[in-house]
Amino acid sequence: MTPTLNVSDRVLVLKDDISNVNYGIGEIVVFYHPDTYVDVSQASKLVDSLKIWNYFDAPSQMVYIKRIIGLPGDVIKIDTLGNIYRNNELLTFKGILNETFTNQEKYSVPNDSYFLLGDNRSNSQDSRVFGYVPVDNLIGKAFYVVYPYENIQILDND
């Protein structure tokens, strides 16, 4: 997520289970990999809402952080210049540089999923690689960097 986030940054997350989060374009979200089974039972949600993630979690419990580019039902197009179009409208984000790509891609987001990209587009494992992220795999919105202290800031979600 460079330049928005650094590898060592720790963020606060407004969790979906607690506050019934509505997600929008440009927001930075924390989620489980699309191949991860997510138990949506109330007991599991309660335990998960209290969890603090770390680097030592099993791979199946690792979480990722990316930016929402496509909502359920959207059509996303990335051209060879790195421009991103959502339903034929150009998306732009502050501080994110477009990077050139060798081929043009088009993605139709399923009605129960999101399309997510990292801010470091040329070096990111994101929806271009692992596919669409089901809504049940979203944990919440990242909204504040809390560590390291010199990087404390509100995250710009647009």
Q: Where do the protein language model's features map onto the residues?
A:
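Extended hydrophobic leader/signal-anchor segments used for secretion and membrane insertion
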Residues: M1-D158
